[in-house]
């Protein structure tokens, strides 16, 4: 899981030729804490994707631009184009995330 140090590093992943999963989260979010332990398993099941953890509080303007108002949320891009999103305020399970990633 990549944790970008700044907006420029984060932006560089949007244009990637590979599928990139942006995982929007926050340290204070209990539903995000629930999913952290299984993220390595999810990443292992999707080796063709790059995973980028985005702290919504650090990148609030980006979250607003991308209409990320509930966390945890996932947005998948490739070559600057959004391929899919799993964005809502509900707690997400490993199975739900894997099912979503299988569709993009």
Please place each PLM-identified region on the residue numbering.
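Local sequence-structure signature of Cys/Sec-based thiol-disulfide redox active-site neighborhoods
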Residues: 11-41
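Non-catalytic, surface beta->alpha helical segment in thiol-disulfide oxidoreductase systems
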Residues: 76-104
């Amino acid at each position: 899981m990549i944790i970008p140090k700044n907006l420029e590093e984060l932006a560089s992943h949007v244009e990637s030729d590979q599928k990139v999963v942006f995982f929007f989260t926050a340290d204070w979010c209990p539903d995000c804490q629930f999913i952290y332990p299984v993220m390595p398993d999810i990443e292992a099941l999707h080796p063709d994707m790059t995973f980028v953890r985005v702290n919504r509080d650090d990148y609030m303007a980006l979250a607003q631009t991308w209409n990320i108002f509930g966390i945890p949320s996932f947005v998948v891009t490739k070559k600057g184009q959004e391929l899919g999103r799993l964005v809502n305020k509900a707690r997400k399970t490993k199975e739900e995330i894997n099912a979503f990633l299988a569709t993009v």
